[in-house]
Amino acid sequence: MFLVSTRNFPPELGGMQNLMEGLSNALTNHGPVKVFADNYQDANTYDQNSKLNIERISGFKIFRKYRKANLVKDFIKQNQIRACFFDHWKSIENIDLEILKKTKSFCLIHSKEINHPVGSSLNKRVLKSLGKADFVIANSKFTKELGLKLGLKD
């Protein structure tokens, strides 16, 4: 089984939403997929027509990220997960490293989301969060080079 934790997922429109949907659907060729995604208008209709097992998290944004992280942690503890995929450093930020050690983890990065001055509190949060992932996947060569300049390990 694969786990996907994302802030960006259809029916919301956008490039990241399409990427995470495509990744999730492609993973179904290799086993079941559980998606934890933020709730969105008309999500029930989308979810009922999807072959994915989608759990939506709603509520105020500040609480939603903690609720989703707790659901993800519990799911990893209770299931045999082959790999976890996170769409953003904030999606892996509140997942305990010890729990992530039960599986392989992949986190996507995008230049806009990691571009914080070296040594700033946001830069430190980004590096600490991404340090938990077994694999950090940049969306471009530019993003990879920016990440290295900002302190990511190659």
Regions flagged by a language model, labelled:
Residues 1, 82-83, 135:
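Structural motif
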Residues 70-80:
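Short, well-structured alpha-helical segments in soluble
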Residues 77, 128-129:
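Structural alpha-helical scaffold elements that stabilize or flank donor/cofactor-binding regions
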Residues 6-13, 19-64, 143:
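N-terminal strand-loop element at the rim of the active site
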Residues 30-31, 81, 102, 133:
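Short, well-ordered alpha-helix to beta-strand connector turns
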Residues 86-92:
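Short His-centered aromatic/hydrophobic patch
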Residues 92-93, 105-120, 132-135:
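A short, histidine- and acid-enriched strand-loop-helix "catalytic/donor-clamping" loop
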Residues 133-154:
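A short, active-site helix/loop in glycosyltransferases that binds the activated sugar's phosphate group
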